[in-house]
């Protein structure tokens, strides 16, 4: 039973009988208006990456799982006029049965159905009008977070590179490592057609209450993890944050310089943020051999054991790989490629790029099959972070400031892998490519004696980024999609 009611702030709503019912309920008609820009700063809405659907955050006055389509514009195609119908359409997905007095309700209220019928008739007339050679379409204003421009922002950086020593590796902290210029810190990413919400660490932790965020990948993923820790703590010393690495087996192995990852928990909100090192995102298993070099089976078609073992504990999973897929690195790590449990050499997998493509597609396919079993989990695959051939430039945006156009991601491998799946893309490649001045190149190598810091040589790393810096923007894009 479905009743349609006008969209009023105080409209009384009660729970529905939840037996897998999918109901589309028109809850109101606003006055005609032009298409508006999506604005992620609306405090009452949480808009996903395409700025089309927003989940209301009202508590008592709205049915759970209600999704609102903010607005859309129906065009007539004689190019003389446009009719704008601004509708609010509630989408209620019901899963559990609750009965009240032996009756089931979705919404309680009343409205004249003639108004709804009139709208449908007008729409039908527009579509079926005579002498209209073109097909009627619905034009929707979308928001592509990967398109936009870098703009100056006096509120940047989000934290201090000096004060966030608790979470930052020295090599990523360019202020600690003696970089002389920091103009690159004063910019934020402005998407085309919508706004990224201004980061607020208190609100972020509240939204992530009782949740676990996992970054799994290579050193770029570790940078993003360290960036988020600095953002969530405001870059301050935070002794109350707990080291819970042992819960995930993240302890320092005997003879190793560091653990395979880190896990920290904010006790006030029970929010856990962790990082796990898996440069290839493959399952690495020592082979049965005793003579050096100790070979490691690199199972291209199996996700890392860490993901398989702890996936059920994650609420947000962020994956990345790319820069360790070279013949040189594979041989230095003594990795031996396997597929279906069998060693593969030559043929298709002789080309390392083919092996990378196969691995990414295999992992995304596996993860997509797992997501229905973990409905609370949101999974993202980060596109590759660009390596610049030269990065001795210190002038921000000398390569330009805008990314425009209708094209897709520069990382076509990740884009094609996630296409049509439940795994979302975190597209950071193009916007990062504009920021060659923000790498850690130009920092000083750590001197043997503190007195020699000024004479220490610099190093030329055009892959990793200074923090604060570009990975902070990656996290803002991630949070906007959550």
Curated annotation (Swiss-Prot):
It is found in: Membrane. The chain crosses the membrane at residues 109-129. It comes from the Eukaryota. Keywords: Membrane, Signal-anchor, Transmembrane, Transmembrane helix. It is a single-pass type II membrane protein. GO terms for cellular component: chloroplast; Golgi apparatus; membrane. May act as a bridging protein that binds pectin and other cell wall polysaccharides. Probably involved in maintaining esterification of pectins. May be involved in the specific O-acetylation of cell wall polymers. This is Protein trichome birefringence-like 15. It comes from Arabidopsis thaliana (Mouse-ear cress). The lineage of its organism: Eukaryota, Viridiplantae, Streptophyta, Embryophyta, Tracheophyta. The gene is TBL15.
């Amino acid at each position: 039973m479905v009743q349609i009611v006008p969209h009023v702030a105080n409209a009384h709503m009660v729970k529905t009988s939840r037996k897998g019912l999918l109901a589309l309920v028109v809850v109101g008609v606003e006055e005609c208006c032009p298409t508006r820009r999506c604005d992620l700063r609306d405090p009452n809405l949480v808009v996903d990456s395409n700025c089309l659907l927003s989940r209301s955050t009202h508590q008592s006055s709205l049915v759970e799982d209600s999704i609102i389509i903010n607005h859309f514009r129906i065009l007539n195609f004689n190019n003389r006029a446009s009719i704008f119908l601004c509708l609010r359409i509630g989408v209620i997905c019901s899963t559990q049965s609750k009965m009240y007095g032996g009756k089931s309700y979705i919404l309680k209220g009343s409205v004249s159905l003639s108004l709804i019928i009139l709208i449908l008739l007008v729409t039908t007339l527009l579509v079926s009008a005579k002498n209209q050679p073109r097909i009627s379409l619905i034009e929707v204003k979308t928001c592509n977070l990967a398109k936009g421009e870098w703009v100056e922002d006096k509120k940047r950086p989000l934290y201090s590179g000096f004060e966030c020593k608790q979470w930052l590796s020295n090599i990523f902290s360019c202020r600690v490592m003696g970089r002389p210029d920091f103009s690159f810190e004063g910019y934020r990413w402005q998407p085309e057609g919508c706004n990224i919400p201004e980061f607020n660490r208190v609100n972020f932790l509240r939204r992530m209450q009782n949740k676990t965020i996992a970054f799994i990948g290579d050193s770029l993923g570790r940078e993003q993890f360290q960036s988020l820790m600095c953002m969530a703590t405001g870059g301050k010393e935070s002794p109350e944050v707990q080291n819970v690495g042992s819960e995930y087996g993240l302890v320092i192995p005997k003879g190793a310089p560091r653990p395979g990852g880190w896990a920290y928990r904010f006790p006030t909100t029970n929010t856990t943020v962790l990082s796990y090192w898996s440069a290839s995102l493959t399952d690495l298993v020592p082979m049965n051999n005793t003579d050096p070099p100790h070979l490691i089976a690199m199972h291209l078609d199996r996700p890392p054991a860490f993901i398989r073992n702890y996936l059920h504990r994650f609420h947000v999973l962020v994956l990345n790989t790319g820069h360790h897929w070279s013949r040189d690195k594979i041989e230095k790590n003594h990795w031996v490629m396997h597929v279906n449990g069998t060693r593969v050499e030559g043929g298709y997998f002789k080309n390392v790029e083919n092996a990378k493509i196969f691995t990414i597609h295999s992992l995304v396919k596996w993860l997509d099959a797992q997501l229905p079993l973990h409905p609370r989990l949101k999974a993202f695959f980060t596109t590759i972070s660009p390596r610049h051939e030269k990065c001795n430039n210190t002038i921000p945006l000398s390569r330009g400031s805008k990314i425009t156009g209708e094209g897709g991601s520069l990382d076509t491998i990740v884009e094609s892998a996630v296409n049509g799946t439940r795994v979302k893309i975190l597209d950071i490649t193009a916007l990062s490519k504009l920021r060659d001045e923000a790498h850690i190149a130009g920092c000083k190598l750590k001197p043997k004696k503190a007195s020699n810091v000024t004479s220490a040589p610099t190093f030329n790393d055009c892959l990793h980024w200074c923090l604060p810096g570009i990975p902070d923007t990656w996290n803002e894009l991630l949070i906007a999609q959550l």
